[in-house]
């Protein structure tokens, strides 16, 4: 091993593995903006209805994961978990994120760069005013 490799090994042992764009990952439930198909706010996830944009994404796209904000009660998350299970899409409940307004994300396993990831309605506008 070279000195640089030993240095890197020691730093990773002390500080953990390096993470790209940690601020962005804190906002987007552990994933990157460039991978997101659809994002809902916490308020949108708490609504009784299931957003059709999320269902459409789950039904038509493969190689994706549903990320859910763990601060939201399970009753509000369960409808999205059932939809993901129906389409055999894996889901993750993220409970170690920092303060974020994001409640749900449907993300790819690679960069897709969707221009507008948010479902813009009254609840979204109230959240980000």
Predicted regions and their residues:
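Extended, non-globular alpha-helical segments
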Residues: 39-60
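N-terminal, charge-rich interaction modules
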Residues: 1-45
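Extracellular/luminal Protease-associated
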Residues: 58, 62-73
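Gly/Ser/Thr-rich loops at beta-strand to alpha-helix junctions
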Residues: 72-75, 98
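Short basic, glycine-rich beta-strand/loop surfaces that mediate nucleic-acid
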Residues: 81-129
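Solvent-exposed alpha-helices and their adjacent loops that cap or buttress functional pockets
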Residues: 30-31, 58-59, 96-98
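N-terminal targeting/trafficking signals and adjacent low-complexity tails
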Residues: 2-7, 11, 53, 60, ...
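Conserved strand-to-helix beginnings and helix N-cap segments that scaffold or border functional pockets
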Residues: 51, 77-80
């Amino acid at each position: 091993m070279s000195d640089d490799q030993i240095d890197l090994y020691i730093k990773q042992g002390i500080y953990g593995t390096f993470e790209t764009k940690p601020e962005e990952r804190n906002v987007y439930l552990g994933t990157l903006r460039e991978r997101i198909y659809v994002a809902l706010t916490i308020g949108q996830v708490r609504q009784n209805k299931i957003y059709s944009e999320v269902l459409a994404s789950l039904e038509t796209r493969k190689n994706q994961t549903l990320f859910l904000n763990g601060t939201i009660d399970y009753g509000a998350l369960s409808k999205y978990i059932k939809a993901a299970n129906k389409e055999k899409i894996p889901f993750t409940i993220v409970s170690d994120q920092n303060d974020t307004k994001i409640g749900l994300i449907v993300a790819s396993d690679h960069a897709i760069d969707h221009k507008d990831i948010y479902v813009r309605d009254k609840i979204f506008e109230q959240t980000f005013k």
